[in-house]
């Protein structure tokens, strides 16, 4: 496969991921295939977002890091000091991706680091590792294109998370806004009773204790459920099981208490 074909394959990752959840393991696999190297996508805080192995390294510490999906803090912080592509670092480099306790085994292990940038911010690092053959210019071009694509996907994922949070908050505010004063009072007592995100509620007990009718509680729950904020299920004489579906509900209720 020539350089142009490999570049097109990397760029197709963007088209494929449009409208879908970002899969950094799949992206790592594509980069690993076209560059023929072990590939790791690491966030700025050291979280391993995705990886693909081209050449196996039999090392328990590396296996543990891959299982935990996290690199050591000291190593991760060190990566942030690398602000441009650094190619063909040997096993004596503090940035080597090969296990330092096996230096003699991986004497011909080469590491390349490519900063992942987006929106003017450092988002993470693309790490490539290869045994025997050094990385050449074509590999570095592909790595930098790959890092750009990964950066765009990280930004898209962040943007979607922010949008989802705003949507969740708006839904909760609308649901709370639809409640009457007595229904809102009932809701506050309901979640004080639950002491968490889910639990069993006996409406008649709350109604008697607070001095409101049972129908007010039922109406309040119905409004929240129709908004998709909670889920409720009648358990007959035992009461009603309630589960919070929107994580913004409890903080918003807490805010109302203190305002």
Curated annotation (Swiss-Prot):
Its main location: cytoplasm. Keywords: Cytoplasm, DNA-binding, Repressor, Transcription, Transcription regulation. Signal peptide: none annotated. GO terms for cellular component: cytoplasm. It is found in: Cytoplasm. Residues 1-155 are annotated as: GAF domain. The keyword Mitochondrion does not apply. It holds the Pfam family CodY. Residues 203-222 bind DNA. One of its GO terms (biological process) is negative regulation of DNA-templated transcription. One of its GO terms (molecular function) is DNA-binding transcription factor activity. DNA-binding global transcriptional regulator which is involved in the adaptive response to starvation and acts by directly or indirectly controlling the expression of numerous genes in response to nutrient availability. During rapid exponential growth, CodY is highly active and represses genes whose products allow adaptation to nutrient depletion. Belongs to the CodY family. NCBIfam families: codY_Gpos, PRK04158.1. This is Global transcriptional regulator CodY. The gene is codY.
């Amino acid at each position: 496969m020539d350089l142009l074909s490999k570049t097109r394959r990397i760029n197709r990752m963007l088209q494929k991921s449009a409208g879908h959840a970002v899969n950094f393991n799949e992206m790592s696999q594509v980069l690993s295939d076209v560059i023929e190297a072990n590939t790791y996508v690491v966030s700025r805080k050291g979280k391993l977002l995705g990886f693909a192995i081209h050449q196996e390294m039999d090392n328990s510490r590396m296996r543990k890091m891959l299982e935990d999906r996290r690199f050591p803090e000291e190593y991760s912080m060190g990566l942030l000091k690398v602000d441009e592509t650094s190619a063909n670092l040997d096993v004596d480099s503090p940035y080597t991706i090969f296990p330092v306790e096996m230096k003699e085994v991986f004497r011909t292990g080469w590491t390349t680091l490519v900063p992942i940038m987006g929106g003017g911010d450092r988002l993470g690092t693309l790490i490539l590792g290869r045994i025997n053959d050094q990385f050449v210019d074509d590999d570095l071009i592909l790595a930098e294109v790959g890092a750009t694509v990964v950066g765009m996907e990280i930004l898209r994922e962040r943007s979607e998370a922010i949008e989802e949070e705003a949507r969740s908050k708006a839904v909760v505010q609308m649901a709370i806004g639809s409640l009457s004063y007595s229904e809102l009072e009932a809701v506050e007592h309901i979640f004080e009773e639950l002491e968490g995100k889910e639990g069993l509620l006996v409406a008649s007990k709350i109604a008697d204790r607070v001095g409101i009718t049972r129908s007010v509680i039922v109406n309040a729950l119905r409004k929240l459920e129709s908004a998709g904020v909670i889920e409720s299920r009648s358990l007959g004489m035992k009461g009603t099981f309630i589960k919070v579906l929107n994580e913004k509900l409890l903080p918003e209720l807490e805010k109302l208490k203190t305002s």
